[in-house]
A protein has these predicted regions:
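Solvent-exposed serine/threonine-rich low-complexity stretches and specific carbohydrate-binding patches
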Residues: 136-140, 246-250, 341-353
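Acidic/hydrophobic-patterned starts of short beta strands in beta-sheet-rich repeat architectures
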Residues: 99-110, 152-158
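Acidic, divalent-cation-chelating loop motifs in proteins
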Residues: 92-101, 126
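Short glycine/acidic-enriched loop and turn motifs that connect beta-strands
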Residues: 111-115, 161-166, 267-268
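Repeated scaffold domains used in trafficking and secretory/extracellular systems
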Residues: 91, 140-149
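Short beta-strand edge/turn micro-motifs at domain boundaries
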Residues: 128-139, 177-200, 271-300
Length: 402
C-alpha cells in the first residue's frame, strides 16, 4: 500500500488547554495515557537532577516559558556545548518545566553548516548555575528541528532519507517527514521516546499541533467534527466512499472531549468500523479530533501486541476473527507515512472450520528509519468476499523499533 495521506510539517500554534490537563501533567511520567508505551532510552547524564540551585518557577506551566536573561542568548551556551566557529552554532534556546517539578530546563539546539544542515538537541537542568547538568542529547537530525510541545515534551522533526517521499530525491528536494516525541522519565533519568495516541489524521504530536494551528486559522474545519474525521479515516485508510454513513454512538458534541463513531461502508457487504476519537490535548474549546482506535465489532480483534507498545521485527500479531475458507484477513505494518513495510496473511487456528476463531501471525517489517523508532500502525484488514473491498478493520497505534 502506498502512502495513504501525508501531512506536511507546518508551524504549530497555541491552543487552549483545560485545567485538568494541567493537573494531569503534574504527574510527570507516571500513570499517564500519553506515556504508556514502552520507550527507547536516549543518552543522558546518569546523575539525578539537582534542583536546589535551579531556576524555580511558581508552578509547573504547560508549554514554552521565557528563559532567564542570563541564559537566553546563544553565546552563553557556546562554551558549555563546545561549538566550533564555521562548523556549528547555537540555533535556539527555549525553556520550560520539562521534568515534572517547578524548575525551568533549557532546550538548546545546535546547527551544523554544510550538506544536511544537521541538528543536535540538548536539554539542560540547573541552567543558571556554573555547571548546567545535561539531561538529554540527540544528535544528527538531518535538516532537523526541535521544539517544546504544549504538553511539556520535546518534539523533533527530521528527514528520513530512505522514506517514500525522500528516497532518490536530490538534496534540495528532501523534506522533513519523520517526527518523534520525548518525555521525561524519572525511572530512566532522561527523556525517552513516547507515542502520541493518534492514528488519524495525525500520527504524531508534532503534526497534530501543526494541524491545530492550521485549523485555528480557518483551514480544514472538518477536523473539528467527529463524524467527518471518522469518515475521512474510512475514506483514506479503507478506501471507502465519501458517502459512507456515520453514526454518533457517544460524545462528539461541540464541548465533548471524546467520541465513538460508527462508519458503515456503501459496498454490497455493508461492513462497519467503530472509531474512537479524542480532542487534541483535552481541549474542548476548538481542539481537533484525533482517532485513537479503530475496531471491527464482532468481526475481528487484535489482542497482541498491546496498543502503543514498542515493537521489534518480527512481531507476533494475535487476535480473533471470522474464518471463511481458512482465511481471516491481512495484517499490515504501516510506517510514519502510512506506507506498508510488512504484511502477512492471517489464517485461523489449525483445524478450525468456518466461523470465529483465534489467530497468530508472525510479521516481518523493515523500517526505512534506522536511527531509532518511528510511530506507526498495526492494521488487520478483513475483506468483503462479495466484491473484494475492505469490509472492516482493526487498527492499533504502535512504536516501531528499527
Amino acid at each position: 500500500m502506498k502512502a495513504l495521506l501525508y501531512w506536511k510539517h507546518r508551524s504549530a500554534g497555541a491552543s487552549l488547554l483545560f485545567l485538568f490537563i494541567f493537573t494531569f501533567t503534574l504527574t510527570a511520567c507516571g500513570g499517564n495515557t500519553e506515556s504508556n508505551a514502552r520507550s527507547l532510552p536516549q543518552s543522558h547524564n546518569s546523575t539525578t537532577p539537582n534542583t536546589s540551585s535551579a531556576t524555580s518557577t511558581a508552578q509547573i506551566v504547560l508549554g514554552r516559558q521565557p528563559c532567564p536573561a542570563v541564559v537566553s542568548t546563544p553565546s552563553h551556551w557556546d562554551s558549555i556545548i563546545g561549538t566550533q566557529n564555521g562548523v556549528s552554532r547555537i540555533e535556539g534556546v527555549n525553556c520550560a518545566t520539562l521534568i515534572g517539578v517547578p524548575v525551568l530546563q533549557a532546550l538548546v539546539t545546535v546547527r551544523y553548516e554544510g550538506t544536511g544542515s544537521y541538528l543536535d538537541v540538548y536539554v539542560f537542568n540547573n541552567i543558571t548555575g556554573a555547571n548546567p547538568v545535561q539531561l538529554f542529547k540527540l544528535q544528527g537530525l538531518n535538516k532537523g528541528g526541535a521544539r517544546i510541545s504544549k504538553y511539556n515534551t520535546i518534539l523533533t522533526a527530521e528527514v528520513d532519507l530512505a522514506s517514500g517521499v525522500n528516497s532518490n530525491q536530490p538534496g534540495t528536494g528532501v523534506i522533513q517527514d519523520l517526527f518523534r516525541e520525548f518525555k521525561w522519565s524519572d525511572g530512566a533519568g532522561t527523556f525517552v521516546q513516547v507515542t502520541f495516541p493518534g492514528i488519524f489524521p495525525d500520527l504524531t504530536r508534532y503534526q497534530a499541533e501543526a494541524d491545530q494551528e492550521q485549523v485555528n486559522q480557518g483551514h480544514q474545519p472538518w477536523k473539528l467534527d467527529a463524524d467527518m474525521t471518522a469518515n475521512a479515516l474510512a475514506v483514506n485508510m479503507l478506501k471507502w466512499s465519501t458517502s459512507a454513513q456515520t453514526t454518533i454512538v457517544s460524545g462528539g458534541g461541540s464541548h465533548d472531549l471524546n467520541a465513538v463513531v460508527t462508519v458503515k461502508s456503501t459496498s454490497p457487504g455493508g461492513g462497519t468500523i467503530t472509531v474512537t476519537l479524542s480532542r487534541l490535548e483535552g481541549n474542548a474549546n476548538g481542539g481537533i479530533w484525533e482517532a485513537t482506535a479503530v475496531q471491527a465489532g464482532n468481526m475481528a480483534t487484535i489482542t497482541a501486541p498491546l496498543n502503543r507498545d514498542l515493537l521489534t521485527s518480527p512481531v507476533t500479531v494475535a487476535g480473533s476473527g471470522s474464518v471463511l475458507g481458512g482465511n481471516i484477513g491481512r495484517v499490515l505494518i504501516l510506517d510514519h507515512l502510512y506506507n506498508t513495510i510488512g504484511h502477512a496473511e492471517v489464517k485461523g487456528t489449525t483445524g478450525a472450520g468456518n466461523g470465529n476463531t483465534t489467530f497468530s501471525a508472525s510479521v516481518t517489517y523493515r523500517s526505512t528509519f534506522r536511527a531509532g523508532a518511528e510511530e506507526g500502525v498495526v492494521v488487520l484488514y478483513i475483506e468483503d468476499h462479495t466484491d473484494g473491498s475492505l469490509a472492516t478493520a482493526v487498527m492499533e497505534k504502535e512504536l516501531l523499533g528499527a
